[in-house]
A protein has these predicted regions:
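Short acidic DE-rich linear segments
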Residues: 166-168
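Active-site-proximal, substrate-binding regions of enzyme catalytic domains
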Residues: 2-128, 137-146, 151, 156-162
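Conserved SAM-binding loop
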Residues: 132-133
Length: 168
């Protein structure tokens, strides 16, 4: 059975190892984080610290956008967009990785401390009862400070998190 993780779409472009896990995983991705990919790809702001890494990641973002725009995948994603909190049918990537897109709705529940995308990630983790996978240490700190009742995993601990069942 696949282990589920909540995450932003851009994490797949930045952290290639997420597409090559040793056991099955399902990445539940809020739809608005897919929309962010367009801004990141075409924006002049650096995503990565060096121009070479930035160009590589922006190329990977372009590949992700093309994947999500593929007519077969686009139809599946559009099914999720028909109603709040609906999930798309699974989008298989390879033998071990499946994407599921969720039409998360930010309700300002955590709006004073967290931005809308962060709030969607939090609410999705709560609704899906799945851990949130992130590489943003400041977001991790805010989650801890606000005592948000979700499991959070730093991307550096991803391999450990996929090694069987455990409780944090």
């Amino acid at each position: 059975m696949a282990r589920s993780f909540i995450m932003e779409a851009v994490m797949l472009a930045v952290h290639g190892q997420l597409l090559a896990p040793e056991s099955p995983v399902e990445y539940i991705i809020p739809y608005t984080t897919i929309l962010e990919l367009y801004e990141m790809k075409d924006g002049s702001e650096l995503i990565m610290p060096t121009p070479e890494d930035d160009a590589h990641v922006k190329n990977k973002i372009g590949e992700l956008i093309a994947y999500f725009e593929d007519s077969f995948n686009k139809k599946k994603i559009e099914k999720a967009l028909q109603m709040a909190w609906r999930k798309s049918p699974p989008l298989p990537i390879n033998e071990y990785v499946t994407f599921t897109i969720i039409y998360a709705v930010e309700n300002e529940e955590y709006g004073e401390v967290f931005d809308p995308i962060e709030t969607e990630l939090i609410l999705t983790a709560i609704k899906e009862k799945s851990p949130l996978l992130t590489d943003q240490l400041d977001f991790l700190d805010k989650l801890i400070d606000a005592q948000i009742p979700i499991e959070v995993i730093d991307v550096e601990d991803f391999e450990f998190a996929t090694e069987g069942d455990f409780l944090l």
